[in-house]
Amino acid sequence: MPFWVILGISSLTWLAILHSLRHFKQRWDLNSLLIILLVGLLLPAVAATFNVLSSPSNRWLLLSTLLFSVLTMRLIDDWKKLDSWDYRLFLGASVGLIIIIWVVNGFTFNVSARDLISYILLFVLITWFIGSSAMHLSRLTLIIGCFTLLCLNLINTGFGATMTSSGVANPQQLYRGSATSWINKYLDGAQKALPRNDNFYRTTLTPGFYARGAASGKKNISMLLGTHDIASYFSVQNRSISQFSQSIGNQEADPNSPLSTADGRTTTRNLLGVRYIFELADRYDPKNIPVGYHALKNNDGHVRIFKDQPVAGGLSNKTGTIVFVNDNFLPLVSTQNAQISAAKYQRLNAVDKEQAMIQAPITDKPITGVKQVQPQKIATTVPYTVKVRNVTDRPVNSSSRLSQKLVTTNKKIVNDNQTTNKDGLHQLVSDCQGHQLTYDLILDHPEKWQNKELYLEVSGMTMVKPTLNQFLQNNAANAVFANRPNTTLAKIQQFRQALHTDWQLSGYYLSASTAYRSNNFSQQSPTNLSNYSIRKRVILNLGYSSHLRRIVTVRFSQVPELKIHHVKLMAVGFKGRYQRQIKAIQKHGLKQQKVTNNTITGRTQAQTASVLTTSIPYSTGWHLTVDDKPTKTQVVNTGFVGAKIPAGQHKVKLQYHTPGLRLGAIISLIGLLLLLVSILWQSHAWLHNQSNQ
């Protein structure tokens, strides 16, 4: 079940919170903090602020343990002062909690044995408090009893994760040493084929390289393997990367990983200087390799396949790895003698924005002495016709009147939806059973789109969430199709399930595929916390291919209906002018380039003033000197370091200094001095008091 936050507090802390709230005026300071905590919990902006001004994350609530600890100690201190109204509150609020749990579970108390024991221990604790007061037990006896119950609660909580029999957590555990071995063999040793010289390069994986859910770890694995993967960039490190990724409509971008694999987009890889791409061996098809790519080969001329290196526990890509070499990657630093204004750039669609950066760098602030050019629109719109697939499900008893009525309803849904989508895909719906329909976008003149990269742009998405009544109607229709009686008991069970299902379906999933490439994206629900962001426009890369692609199949799930303002197919080629532009940028790369951990040096030579263009994420920490003279930097290409370089030959040096490092060191030093003074002052006061006694 999705959740916004789970607060794991003990029964003792629960009673401490109730006790503090009852004595609100006496504990106004602690109760004020409780209220602030509750209000902050309801506001995603608070969680986002504590998560370095990024997406919401409720890790900040770990601070609440300090408050809960103080409240618990106050409860123990005030044990002798507890009266009958305190005990009534403890009992009444706990019974109310159980009633709420019963209601949200569909008026059943269908909870796990572990949860049931926790509730029993809560009432045992209340009984212990009441009994200790009635029998006038000592404070030590009370504490021993509370500590015993607390230990039992901890044992019960940890039992599910530590039990030796198969449970929820047990199958997720790996064999000892498997994780380390898997990291080292993640690319089947293909990373060893990369050059180990001083030449700078970046790498990436193809989308869907690793299918396991744990694949999100690849963002860190690349750093351990030293492959310079573009997925290792994080938004919390540098906002500029996220701005660039969102600008070009990278659908893989999320708050935690702004680039990921860049959705496999050819031009984005070139712009970021991606030299090597890791691909699964069983997906290799020479006709799907874009211009400028070639597979790494053995001495005999055959494609070099790095055999699969499985690890105990099923950690493996099951096929092996090959390496593509990209000859169109752009230099880390180059100079260009033209620029495109940000205003002209913003008028382009997301695909043409990406292509514009090949024509000339985008400058937020115009650079004097460098000519401005008009960006050319490269992407070609692909005409298509929508075909709604018929509902294939047939009732078991097709002769019944109700079955025939539902079949007729399904046909009407398909026909009406076909009419709605006659001028383009605008509405995706479900049949009367709740099954989402499938849509084929039939391409006009498919031979025109060979040897090009296809993109599907989806904009203005609005999901229609399911209702409780709709959920029950779908289940009733399924019962008719299966010729199964929909009994009262079954309806009650469906109602209970709907209480949870309605909350789960607060996001949706959309996929598009050709015969040679599939792609998808998810609109995460608000309960997804760190990965949640509203998606109103998405670009899905359907890949490059010289094959004939006739149909793009679109599917959706998790919601009964999805309304779309506009669906557009676009195609981009990489021959002719594109290749000339790539070669021109490569020719003007930084000469004698040397890259170290925080410094880049080299020489530029140009007949006119030019724009220094890099794929280094912009930060105020980067300082540029030209011929040992400080030069101001600025943002180029919506997120990277750039600057003006005068005509002629120049020595260029880019060096990174962590912003605020010196100020932070000074503040830390002042804090240490204040701490030392405070310790000395308190020590002096303690010695003075001792001497007076």
Where are these predicted regions, by residue range?
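Hydrophobic alpha-helical transmembrane segments
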Residues: 1-11, 82-85
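A cross-kingdom signal targeting lumenal/periplasmic-facing segments of multi-pass membrane
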Residues: 225-342, 364, 368-369, 374
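Hydrophobic, aromatic-rich transmembrane alpha-helices
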Residues: 6-31, 127-133
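Active-site-proximal, structured, solvent-exposed surfaces of multi-pass membrane proteins
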Residues: 390-693
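Membrane-proximal, lumen/periplasm-facing interface regions of secretory-pathway glyco-
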Residues: 114-115, 156-188, 526, 530-533, ...
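Contiguous transmembrane helix-bundle modules in multi-pass membrane proteins
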Residues: 32-45, 51-179, 656-693
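Extracytoplasmic/lumenal acceptor-recognition loop(s) of multi-pass membrane glycoenzymes
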Residues: 152-173, 194-266, 520, 619
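Catalytic cores of secreted or luminal carbohydrate-active enzymes
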Residues: 270-273, 286-292, 315-424, 557-577
